[in-house]
Amino acid sequence: MTMLALRLGLRSVDICNLRLSDICWKSGTISFVQQKTGQPLTLPFPVEVGNLLARYILEGRPKCDLPNVFITLKHPYTRLRSSRCYTSSLAILGRKKSAADVRGLHIARRTFASHLLAAGNPVSMISSTLGHADESTVDEYLATDGHRMRQCAIGLAGIELTGVLI
């Protein structure tokens, strides 16, 4: 689950709604309708993500007739809820959510966007890959790009501080 957010930028709700039929192994793509925007999205997945998905489906996913890729590990099986997506990912890794984990799986989505920007991809492509309906929505994701943010800083040379600084 974490790799789908980190390597494809998927929202947790879309990860939890992902169905086995949404994965095309021949073309190496995932196609689905986004929950938030209602827009269809098709993304290629890297081989490592495909291998992890295949391993989970074949070796980790409980055997059942549910169409969802990610399901609860205990009977009665149901699809995972997006509110449990991150904690379920941690549980698989043998970890627990800490009080500092306020963003959950969404931080992986931000990291994905920052990596695309650092690689020189245009904002329009990043926005499209994230499935945003409005290109300006991507700005909050890109604020984590410290290198480019430092280029926006204004120099303070020649400006004197007066008064008391508390």
What does each model-found stretch correspond to?
Residues 34, 130-155:
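Catalytic-site neighborhood detector that most strongly recognizes the C-terminal catalytic loop/helix
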Residues 22-25, 101-102, 121-140:
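Short, polar N-cap/turn motifs at the start of nucleic acid-interacting alpha helices
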Residues 47-100:
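Active-site/catalytic core of tyrosine-dependent DNA strand-transfer enzymes
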Residues 1-11, 30, 114-115, 157:
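Short pre-functional
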Residues 4-17, 119-121, 132:
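A short, glycine-centered helix-capping/turn motif at helix boundaries
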Residues 8, 12-13, 17-51:
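Conserved tyrosine-mediated DNA breakage-rejoining catalytic core shared by Y-recombinases
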Residues 157-166:
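C-terminal secondary-structure termini that scaffold catalytic or DNA-interacting sites
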Residues 43, 87-128:
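Short, basic (Lys/Arg/His-rich) helix/loop patches that form interaction surfaces
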